[in-house]
Every structure is written in C-alpha cells, then in structure tokens.
C-alpha cells in the first residue's frame, strides 16, 4: 500500500501545520543545543516547555501582570518568554543597581521588530545601539534640540496652541460634553509639530491614528517573532512587520515632505536667522560638516519621530490622566483651581512665565506621574556582559524591564494609601522626577533616560493651568465622579481604555483685564 501525503487545503489547516512545524523546530534546536552550567537566575514563576512564561502575560496588561507576579516571586524576577531571558525590576534598590551602579553594563537596547521599523532601523536616539553614534545623537539632543533655552524658546507656541484649545472649548454649547482625549491629542500635536517642523502639518488625523496603532503594537504584550528570534519564518507568519511597516509609511511620507519643504525654504533664508525649528537645527548640523558621524536624512527622520512620540503621545497621556484624576477627586480640582485663579486674578489669560509660582499644580503633576507614568515599563535595556545583581546571575543579552508603574504604587514606598491620588504626599518631599529617586521614575534614569523631560512637562503645565483657570469641569448627568472608569489600555504609552468625555462650564474672572 502506498502512503499519500496531502497538502493542507484550507487556511486553518495551513495554520495548524505551520504551528506544529515551528514547535518541532524549536524543540529540536533545544534538544541539540549544547548543555551549559545552570546560572543562579532570579526567582520566577514556573516555566512551561517551549513557551516559558508567555501564557502568564497573555490576556492582560503587561505591567499589571508583571506587578502581580513580582508580588509573589520578588522584586527581581526572571521570566522566560519564548527563547528570551527577561528580568523584571520592581524595587528602587534593584532599579538603582541597573540604572546607576551598573548603568554602562545595561546601556544597550534589545533589537525588537516593531522598534526596528518605527526607528528607521534603530537610527533614533531611543533605540540606537550604545556606542559612538548614540553618544553623538544624545549630545545633539541635549545641547541643540531640547536644552532648557531651546524649550523656553517654544513658549509662544505653547501659549498660542493652548489658547486655541480654550477658544475651541468655549465654542461648545452650554452643558455639551466634549471629547477631551481627542482635543488634547490635537493640541499636543500642534505644539510638537510647530516646535519640530515650524508649522502644523496636514495629515494630523492620519499621523495621530498611525502613532496610536504603532504604540499599541509596541506595548501589546508578547511578539512571538521577537520571542523566537531563531525561527525567522515567524516574522512572516505573525504579520507584525507588515502591519507596522504600513503604518510607518504613512508617517514617513509626512516626514519626507517636511524635510524637502525645509530645504526649499532655506534657499532664501539668511544664515544665522532666528526662529529655527528642530528640523532646521538638524539640517544646519547636517550641512556643517563638523560631525564625526554625518547626519543622514534617515537619522533626521528618526529623530523627528522621537520628538513626536515624546511630544504628542506622552504629554497627551499625562494631561488626560491628570484631568481624569481631578474629575474623580473634585476636592483636589477645587484646590488647584483656587491657586491658579488667585494667582491670575483679574487677568484674561495666563502667562507661562508665572507658572513657577503654582506650587500645588506642580504637586498635582508629580502625583499624576507617580500613578500614571507615560511609559509604565521603561524602555527595555539589555545586559552587555554577564554580571551579578543582588546575588543573582544576569546572563549577557538578558532583557531588563523596569516596572516604573509598579514602584509608583508600592505601599513600601508610598504608604497604605499608595493607590490614592493625593498630591499632598509631595509637600516638603525631596523626591522629584529627574531620575535620582529610583522608586519614582516617570522619565527613567541614567544615560538612557528620556531627554525630553523639560519639553513634556512644559506642555502639560500650560495646558492644565489654562483648562483649570478658564473652566469648571464635571461629568455628564447621572455620572458620579468616584465611579469614573480608570481602566488602562494596552500600549507602549499608558492611555485610558475609554476616551474621556467631560462637560466644561466657562469661568469668567471678576474684573478681567
């Protein structure tokens, strides 16, 4: 009798056949791999064959799942995700070891498929490999792009765009609910676009939509193509690269037109002319010929991408969560409004220069960063050399994830009311968000911390101050503040699962000038 082998005839049969084949190849590779001494890895949940701990992260939000597991297995926890070694850090002591004591050892970034596409093959500052190229980009960013003087130069842009937001809200009918989420996204896009590119570029909706979908892919949990790097076919079967490339093309078209238009405008501009945007600064450096590593157009686009991710998504997320917490905690909102309205009493508008005196507002912002860090799992690091942390072996190439969200809610550092929104906890507290206090890391710490901190905070401060000065806020009829849904959405940036709809009531200051 002759055996007959039939090809799969339906998509489901192909999927089953492909999955079985891939699992067989992974198992075979594991069996044939030479045995090495077992390292003293950090504790962690029991691993299953082939998949490790992947099953324990599926179906939830990664930073929340990791916090729950760390409460069982400890603040330095080992997870095996497919073929990859991962260590999750959930204590300030361990975070300090990673981000300060051994910062150089953990200065590398893991190469992830989504990041490769979004960052133009790791040409940006966030994901570029640690080395001379990254050092040059970091220097350019800190000195030329996001230095305090440069951020201050964008004050007029921030004031104009937030004034437009106020006027837009005033245009709604009395008692009408507004989609605050979409409005703050649009405002932060306007600020970032004008600061980076000189004007608000067409395609705002397409850009924001593409960016949201990309950030979802970045933080949506486990990418099987990343988890099994030895199985090259997974990059094709998973479809993740195709999806992200399609989204990236939408953004790239905008960046291409931005650079080309700037080049045309520069032909008629005198050298040394002021009011340069960030693209102008980068083109000046490109044309100067003074850099050790020349700036290509690809690098310029990658840096612009970083600016938009930091300026749009993270600033909007912080402002959205802050307003959500104020709605949920009306006594805090009243206190913040009283301070702002007393400071600007009799004035028709707010001047950014006077925001430094709003001490309670600064506490509100700090508390928002604590409970809702924009990046809950700090951008992953990778161990460059095998080392020992707190007595545990950390093999080379291990992926390190610092759970800033978990530490910000840990009762060990913040007391039994750690889950409560209470700005007063920062009164007379030396804790700040500049990366020196390792239980509080909204912008990370060390040489690979976020360079856009000053830009982001400035965007949030002026927007919130104007929104609280010009309007009173409430939920729709029948909705109770304490019942406001605060569920998070999966993504690289922490956003609300449901968009925030709230009702503004214009406030008219007495004797306004």
From Swiss-Prot:
Query: Does this UniProt record's set of keywords contain Iron?
Result: yes
Gene3D superfamilies given for it? Answer: Cytochrome P450
Question: Where do the TM regions start and end?
Answer: 12-28
Which cofactors does the annotated protein need, by name? heme
Presence of keyword Oxidoreductase: yes
The GO terms describing molecular function are: heme binding; iron ion binding; monooxygenase activity; oxidoreductase activity, acting on paired donors, with incorporation or reduction of molecular oxygen
Q: Which Pfam families match?
A: p450
What catalytic activity is recorded? Answer: (-)-casbene + reduced [NADPH--hemoprotein reductase] + O2 = 8-hydroxycasbene + oxidized [NADPH--hemoprotein reductase] + H2O + H(+); 4-hydroxycasbene + reduced [NADPH--hemoprotein reductase] + O2 = 4,8-dihydroxycasbene + oxidized [NADPH--hemoprotein reductase] + H2O + H(+); 4,8-dihydroxycasbene + reduced [NADPH--hemoprotein reductase] + O2 = 4,5,8-trihydroxycasbene + oxidized [NADPH--hemoprotein reductase] + H2O + H(+)
EC numbers on record: 1.14.14.-
Q: State the GO CC annotations.
A: membrane
The record's listing under PROSITE patterns reads: CYTOCHROME_P450
The membrane topology term of the UniProt record is: Single-pass type II membrane protein
For the biological process aspect of GO, one term held by this record is:
terpenoid biosynthetic process
Keyword list, A-Z: Heme, Iron, Membrane, Metal-binding, Monooxygenase, Oxidoreductase, Signal-anchor, Transmembrane, Transmembrane helix
Reading the lineage from the top rank, the first entry is Eukaryota
Instruction: Give the metabolic or biological pathway.
Output: Secondary metabolite biosynthesis; terpenoid biosynthesis
Where found, per UniProt?
Answer: Membrane
| InterPro entries the UniProt entry points to | CYP450_71D, Cyt_P450, Cyt_P450_CS, Cyt_P450_E_grp-I, Cyt_P450_sf
Q: Which family does it belong to?
A: Belongs to the cytochrome P450 family.
The task this protein performs is described as:
Involved in the biosynthesis of macrocyclic lathyrane type diterpenoids (also called Euphorbia factors) natural products, including the cyclization route from casbene to jolkinol C, a precursor for ingenol mebutate that is used to treat actinic keratosis, a precancerous skin condition. Catalyzes the hydroxylation of (-)-casbene and 4-hydroxycasbene to produce 8-hydroxycasbene and 4,8-dihydroxycasbene, respectively. Also mediates the formation of 4-hydroxy-8-ketocasbene from 4,8-dihydroxycasbene. Together with ADH1, triggers the biosynthesis of 8-ketocasbene from 8-hydroxycasbene.
What is the protein named? Cytochrome P450 71D445
């Amino acid at each position: 009798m002759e055996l007959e082998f039939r090809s799969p005839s339906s998509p489901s049969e192909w999927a089953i056949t492909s999955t079985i084949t891939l699992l067989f190849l992974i198992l075979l590779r594991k069996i044939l791999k030479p045995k090495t001494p077992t390292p003293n890895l950090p504790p962690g949940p029991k691993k299953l064959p082939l998949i490790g701990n992947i099953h324990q992260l599926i179906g939830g939000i990664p930073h929340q799942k990791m916090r729950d597991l760390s409460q069982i297995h400890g603040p330095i926890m080992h997870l095996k995700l497919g073929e990859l070694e991962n260590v999750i850090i959930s204590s300030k002591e361990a975070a300090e070891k990673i981000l300060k004591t051994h910062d150089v050892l953990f200065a590398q970034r893991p190469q992830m498929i989504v990041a490769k596409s979004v960052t133009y093959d790791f040409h940006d500052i966030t994901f570029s490999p640690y080395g001379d190229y990254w050092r040059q980009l970091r220097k350019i960013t800190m000195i030329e792009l996001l230095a305090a003087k440069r951020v201050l130069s964008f004050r007029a842009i921030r004031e104009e765009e937030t004034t437009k937001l106020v006027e837009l809200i005033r245009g709604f009918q009395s008692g009408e609910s507004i989609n605050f989420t979409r409005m703050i996204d649009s405002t932060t896009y306007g600020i970032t676009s004008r600061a980076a590119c000189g004007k608000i570029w067409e395609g705002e909706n397409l850009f924001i939509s593409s960016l949201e979908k990309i950030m979802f892919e970045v933080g949506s949990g486990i990418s099987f193509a990343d988890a099994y790097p030895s199985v090259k076919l997974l990059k094709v079967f998973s479809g993740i690269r195709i999806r992200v490339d399609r989204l990236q093309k939408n953004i790239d078209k905008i960046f291409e037109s931005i650079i080309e238009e700037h080049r045309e405008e520069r032909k008629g501009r005198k050298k040394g002319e002021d009011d340069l945007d960030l693209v102008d600064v980068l083109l000046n450096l490109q044309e100067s010929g003074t850099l050790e590593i020349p700036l290509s157009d690809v690098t310029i686009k990658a840096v612009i991408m970083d600016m938009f991710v930091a300026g749009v998504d993270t600033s909007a997320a912080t402002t959205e969560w802050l307003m959500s917490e104020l709605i949920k905690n009306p006594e805090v909102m009243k206190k913040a409004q009283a301070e702002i309205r007393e400071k600007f009493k009799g004035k028709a508008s707010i001047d950014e220069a006077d925001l430094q005196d709003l001490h309670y507002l600064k506490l509100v912002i700090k508390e928002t960063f604590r409970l809702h860090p924009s990046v809950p799992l700090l951008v992953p690091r990778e161990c460059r050399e095998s080392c020992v942390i707190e007595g545990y072996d950390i093999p080379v190439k291990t992926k390190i994830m610092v759970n800033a969200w978990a530490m910000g809610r840990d009762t060990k550092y913040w007391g039994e009311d750690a889950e409560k929104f209470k700005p007063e906890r920062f009164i007379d507290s030396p804790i700040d968000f500049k990366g020196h206090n390792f239980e509080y890391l909204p912008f990370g710490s060390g040489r690979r911390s976020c360079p856009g901190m000053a830009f982001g905070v400035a965007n949030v401060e002026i927007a919130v101050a104007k929104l609280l000065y010009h309007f009173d806020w409430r939920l729709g009829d029948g909705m109770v503040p304490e019942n406001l849904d605060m569920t998070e959405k999966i993504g690289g940036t922490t956003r609300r699962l449901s968009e925030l709809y709230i009702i503004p009531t214009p406030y008219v200051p007495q004797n306004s000038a």
